[in-house]
Structures are given as structure tokens and as C-alpha cells.
């Protein structure tokens, strides 16, 4: 399992590179990468284990964030009620956004990132709804429609695969100005 010391920090060139496509079947190394990224998210979302291992809680972790420039990210968006199944949980490989809404969505508190240690205030406008195509660890192709928070999380992780960080989207002059009709998500 990854620890915070394993997370690549802002300033490392791998975070600004376009990641390479992943080929199938997955190598043993890529299978371990996928498993370890998801394990980090699972452990980080358990308050006791998060504290024990001194982790920062996360809902997504992209391969470049652990120093591997490959198009792979683990996403684990929990349900509001912990007894329900997650809103989205999978390792997305070679993801492509095939369609997106005209309407934007943004988190009211802004976004954060395991690779960015400082707080960067401001709204990060993203498409409120997306259709995502990706392969899972078995190479099977999935096409899913996501909206609101799960859509935002997946766009954030896909940005990592293209060398983009969340704060690149923040309006530098008016950080808390969002496009008209933006859905604000708390």
C-alpha cells in the first residue's frame, strides 16, 4: 500500500507529462499499481486507518501521483450513507470522456489534491455530467454516465493523465467566480 511519502508532489515533472496508454493484458507491475492505488483510497477513507498510517483522505489517485506516467487512476467516491455502495468505484484505464454537458459543476469548497500540499482557494469549473469510456483491470471496456461529484472526481483524475492540475482551471483574477448556471455541489 502507498503511504503519503510515496505520493508525488507538485513540482515533480511527471505530474505535467501526458501519460502513456496502458496495454493489455496488464503486466504484473500494472496489476500491482492498480491494486495499491485502490488500497490507498480504501484505507484513507477509514478514519481509524487513515490516522494510523498518517494518510490524507482521497477519492481518487492517478498513476502519475505515484510517479508512474501511465493512463490509470483509482476512483472511490463513497455514498453519502456509509451503509450504501459507493457512488463510483473502479480503476479507470485509458479513460476517455466521450461526451460532456454544456452545464458546469463546481465544488463549493473548491478542490484539493494529494499531490498539492498547499490550499489553493477558488472554484474549479468542470462539466456537471460526462459519459466516460474506460477499460478495467481485466481489459473490459465500460461506458458510464456520471453526474455531479463522481463526474468532477473523474475529470480531476483524467486531468492528471494529461499533465493538468486542478488549480490550472481556477480563474486567476476572480477565483470564486463560476460560469453562469454552474451547479454548486457541497
Swiss-Prot record:
Signal peptide: none annotated. The active site is at residue 157. Belongs to the polypeptide deformylase family. SUPFAM superfamilies: Peptide deformylase (SSF56420). InterPro entries: Peptide_deformylase, Peptide_deformylase_sf. The gene is def. One of its GO terms (biological process) is translation. Its EC number is 3.5.1.88. Fe cation binds at residues 113, 156, 160. Keywords: Hydrolase, Iron, Metal-binding, Protein biosynthesis. GO terms for molecular function: metal ion binding; peptide deformylase activity. It catalyses: N-terminal N-formyl-L-methionyl-[peptide] + H2O = N-terminal L-methionyl-[peptide] + formate. This is Peptide deformylase. Its cofactor is Fe(2+). It comes from the Bacteria. Pfam families: Pep_deformylase. Removes the formyl group from the N-terminal Met of newly synthesized proteins. Requires at least a dipeptide for an efficient rate of reaction. N-terminal L-methionine is a prerequisite for activity but the enzyme has broad specificity at other positions. Binds 1 Fe(2+) ion. HAMAP family: Pep_deformylase.
Amino acid at each position: 500500500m502507498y503511504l503519503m511519502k510515496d505520493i508525488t508532489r507538485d513540482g515533480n515533472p511527471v505530474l505535467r507529462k501526458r501519460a502513456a496508454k496502458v496495454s493489455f493484458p496488464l503486466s504484473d507491475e500494472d496489476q500491482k499499481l492498480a491494486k495499491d492505488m485502490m488500497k490507498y483510497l480504501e484505507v484513507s477513507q477509514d478514519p481509524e486507518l487513515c490516522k494510523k498510517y498518517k494518510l490524507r483522505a482521497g477519492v481518487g489517485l492517478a498513476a502519475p501521483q505515484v510517479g508512474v506516467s501511465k493512463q490509470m487512476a483509482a476512483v472511490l467516491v463513497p455514498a453519502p450513507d456509509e451503509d450504501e455502495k459507493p457512488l463510483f468505484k473502479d480503476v479507470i484505464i485509458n479513460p476517455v470522456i466521450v461526451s460532456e454537458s454544456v452545464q458546469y459543476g463546481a465544488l463549493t469548497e473548491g478542490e484539493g489534491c494529494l499531490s498539492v500540499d498547499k490550499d489553493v482557494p477558488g472554484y474549479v469549473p468542470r462539466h456537471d455530467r460526462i459519459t466516460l469510456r474506460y477499460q478495467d483491470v481485466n481489459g473490459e471496456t465500460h461506458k458510464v454516465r456520471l453526474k455531479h461529484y463522481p463526474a468532477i472526481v473523474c475529470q480531476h483524475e483524467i486531468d492528471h493523465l494529461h499533465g493538468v492540475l486542478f488549480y490550472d482551471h481556477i480563474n486567476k483574477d476572480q477565483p470564486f467566480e463560476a460560469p453562469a448556471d454552474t451547479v454548486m455541489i457541497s
